[in-house]
Swiss-Prot record:
<protein>
    <recommendedName>
        <fullName>Large ribosomal subunit protein uL14</fullName>
    </recommendedName>
</protein>
<keyword id="KW-0699">rRNA-binding</keyword>
<comment type="subunit">
    <text>Part of the 50S ribosomal subunit. Forms a cluster with proteins L3 and L19. In the 70S ribosome, L14 and L19 interact and together make contacts with the 16S rRNA in bridges B5 and B8.</text>
</comment>
<comment type="function">
    <text>Binds to 23S rRNA. Forms part of two intersubunit bridges in the 70S ribosome.</text>
</comment>
<dbReference type="GO" id="GO:0006412">
    <property type="term" value="P:translation"/>
</dbReference>
<keyword id="KW-0694">RNA-binding</keyword>
<keyword id="KW-0689">Ribosomal protein</keyword>
<dbReference type="InterPro" id="IPR000218">
    <property type="entry name" value="Ribosomal_uL14"/>
</dbReference>
<dbReference type="InterPro" id="IPR019972">
    <property type="entry name" value="Ribosomal_uL14_CS"/>
</dbReference>
<comment type="similarity">
    <text>Belongs to the universal ribosomal protein uL14 family.</text>
</comment>
<dbReference type="InterPro" id="IPR005745">
    <property type="entry name" value="Ribosomal_uL14_bac-type"/>
</dbReference>
<dbReference type="InterPro" id="IPR036853">
    <property type="entry name" value="Ribosomal_uL14_sf"/>
</dbReference>
<dbReference type="Pfam" id="PF00238">
    <property type="entry name" value="Ribosomal_L14"/>
</dbReference>
<keyword id="KW-0687">Ribonucleoprotein</keyword>
<dbReference type="GO" id="GO:0003735">
    <property type="term" value="F:structural constituent of ribosome"/>
</dbReference>
<dbReference type="GO" id="GO:0070180">
    <property type="term" value="F:large ribosomal subunit rRNA binding"/>
</dbReference>
<dbReference type="GO" id="GO:0022625">
    <property type="term" value="C:cytosolic large ribosomal subunit"/>
</dbReference>
Length: 122
């Protein structure tokens, strides 16, 4: 569960290292974002000479959350931390690589490019 002011790690090579959630998209009073949801975030930490700079306001899709999510078969999945992937307005990732595993729920939300770039889908 990601809410306003949550700090996320970045799971791609866009150049950002830490994101600060500004807004959860999808409804006027929406409080939380889960895996596959889009947030608006500010870049709090970035590497030099990268595609995104510190202070940029970007959109990101949540790919890992520390809060477990239930699956239809009764199992649960959770990750060690909260991570996101920086995306553009066409919902395509800005980076060309994804680091670490991502959840299978991204497939249902139509983020196929992220699924194909990820080294492991859990």
């Amino acid at each position: 569960m990601i809410q306003m002011q949550t700090i996320l790690d970045v799971a791609d090579n866009s150049g950002a290292k830490k994101l600060f959630c500004i807004k959860v998209l999808g409804g006027s009073k929406r409080k939380y974002a889960g895996i596959g949801d889009i947030i608006v975030a500010s870049v709090k930490e970035a590497i030099p000479n990268s595609k995104v700079k510190k202070g940029d306001v970007v959109k990101a899709v949540v790919v890992r959350t520390a809060k477990e999510i239930g699956r239809p078969d009764g199992s649960y999945i959770r990750f060690d931390g909260n991570s996101g992937v920086v995306i553009n307005n066409q919902k395509e990732p800005v980076g060309t690589r994804i680091f670490g595993p991502v959840a299978r729920e991204l497939r249902a939300k139509k983020f196929m490019k992220i699924i194909s770039l990820a080294p492991e889908v859990l």
